[in-house]
From Swiss-Prot:
The chain crosses the membrane at residues 8-28. PANTHER family: PHOTOSYSTEM II REACTION CENTER PROTEIN J. It comes from Lobularia maritima. Keywords: Chloroplast, Membrane, Photosynthesis, Photosystem II, Plastid, Reaction center, Thylakoid, Transmembrane, Transmembrane helix. This is Photosystem II reaction center protein J. The gene is psbJ. Signal peptide: none annotated. Gene3D superfamilies: 6.10.250.2070.
């Protein structure tokens, strides 16, 4: 595995950021298509 010298590995940041972005976009579009996103 990669040597972590106290810092968070860049791939971890990228993975978490990607999951958050996809999750937020997914919830937004799901709410829009469900008719619940109009109030957001």
């Amino acid at each position: 595995m990669a040597d972590t010298t106290g810092r968070i590995p860049l791939w971890v940041i990228g993975t978490v950021a990607g999951i958050l972005v996809i999750g937020i976009i997914g919830i937004f579009f799901y709410g829009s298509y469900s008719g619940l996103g109009s109030s957001l």
